[in-house]
Amino acid sequence: MFSKEQDQAFLRAAIEVSRKSVANGNHPFGCVLVNETGKIVLESQNNYKTDSRLGHAEANLARMAAVQFEENYLRGCTMYTTVEPCCMCAGTAYWAGLGAVVFGVTEARLGELTGSHPENLTMDLPCRTVFSAGRRQVEVRGPFSELETEILKVHEGFWT
């Protein structure tokens, strides 16, 4: 497990990826995968616009990770994501074999921001609840209130 300062640094890397996602015409979400030595080994943008609504950054990253790395390796990896994974993304991270997930802002907070926007109809199903239904543990850390303003700045004007 990394320190709070390291977690924040990796979350900031995910924020940079979310900015790239917006620049590419997609939704403002991004994530990175960090191995147990603290190296970023993958990053993923959202590609909602080009992947039929299922191209969430976290699910994309989990699928890439499952193809590129062995499951034992992935148990030592942590996904850092700007916003708490939805139930689809949490399930994908679980099945990929990731060991931990760290998020900056809760899905509930995102829902407050997006309201009933048709491209982001959030569900009230925290990732901790999804992971707790599994047969193996996935460590979850978040939210990081000290990064909320920085994360939500990327969303400014996007959902209106």
Tell what function each PLM region has.
Residues M1-S21, T92-T160:
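Zinc-dependent deaminase
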Residues L42, E58-V67:
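Glycine/small-residue-rich phosphate/adenosyl-binding loop
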Residues R63-A96, A100:
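Helix-adjacent hinge/juxtasegments
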Residues Y48, T81, V105:
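Residues that line or immediately flank small-molecule/substrate-binding pockets and catalytic motifs
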Residues V41-Y48:
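Short beta->alpha transition motifs characteristic of CBS
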Residues T50-N60:
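A short, polar/charged loop-to-alpha-helix boundary motif
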Residues N24-P28:
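Short, flexible loop/turn motifs enriched in small residues
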Residues F29-G38:
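Short beta-strand scaffold segments in enzyme catalytic cores
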